[in-house]
């Protein structure tokens, strides 16, 4: 459950290390984002020489949340950290690698490139 001002780890190799959520996309009154939702975020920490710099405003998709997410079959999924993948043009990831597991909800929301790059889909 991601909301405004939430800090997230970055799960790709774009060079960013930490994001700060600015807005949850999808409606004017939308408050929370879960796995597979797109947010607008600011890069708060980045490594030198990366494709994104500190202070850049980017779109990102949430791939892991600490708050449990209920699935249709009644099971719950939760992770140890909040993490996101930075998006480039369209719904494609800006980086070429994804680190750590991602939720199966990304497949339902048609982020196929992220699902194929991820080492594990839970």
Curated annotation (Swiss-Prot):
MF annotations from Gene Ontology: large ribosomal subunit rRNA binding; structural constituent of ribosome
CDD domains documented for this protein: Ribosomal_uL14
Record-linked Gene3D superfamilies: Ribosomal protein L14
InterPro entries: Ribosomal_uL14 (IPR000218), Ribosomal_uL14_bac-type (IPR005745), Ribosomal_uL14_CS (IPR019972), Ribosomal_uL14_sf (IPR036853)
Database matches in PROSITE patterns: RIBOSOMAL_L14 (PS00049)
Pfam families: Ribosomal_L14
Highest taxon listed in the record's lineage: Bacteria
A GO cellular component entry from the record: cytosolic large ribosomal subunit
This protein's UniProt keywords: Ribonucleoprotein, Ribosomal protein, RNA-binding, rRNA-binding
GO biological process: translation
Record flagged with keyword RNA-binding: yes
Protein task: Binds to 23S rRNA. Forms part of two intersubunit bridges in the 70S ribosome.
Subunit composition and interactions: Part of the 50S ribosomal subunit. Forms a cluster with proteins L3 and L19. In the 70S ribosome, L14 and L19 interact and together make contacts with the 16S rRNA in bridges B5 and B8.
Family: Belongs to the universal ribosomal protein uL14 family.
NCBIfam families: rplN_bact
This protein's name: Large ribosomal subunit protein uL14
Source organism of the structure: Bifidobacterium adolescentis (strain ATCC 15703 / DSM 20083 / NCTC 11814 / E194a)
Gene responsible for this protein: rplN
């Amino acid at each position: 459950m991601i909301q405004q001002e939430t800090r997230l780890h970055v799960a790709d190799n774009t060079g960013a290390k930490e994001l700060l959520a600015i807005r949850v996309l999808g409606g004017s009154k939308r408050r929370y984002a879960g796995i597979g939702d797109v947010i607008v975020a600011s890069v708060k920490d980045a490594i030198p020489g990366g494709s994104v710099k500190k202070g850049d405003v980017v779109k990102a998709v949430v791939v892991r949340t600490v708050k449990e997410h209920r699935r249709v079959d009644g099971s719950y999924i939760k992770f140890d950290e909040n993490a996101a993948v930075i998006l480039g043009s369209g719904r494609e990831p800006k980086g070429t690698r994804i680190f750590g597991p991602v939720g199966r909800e990304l497949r339902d929301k048609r982020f196929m490139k992220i699902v194929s790059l991820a080492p594990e889909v839970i």
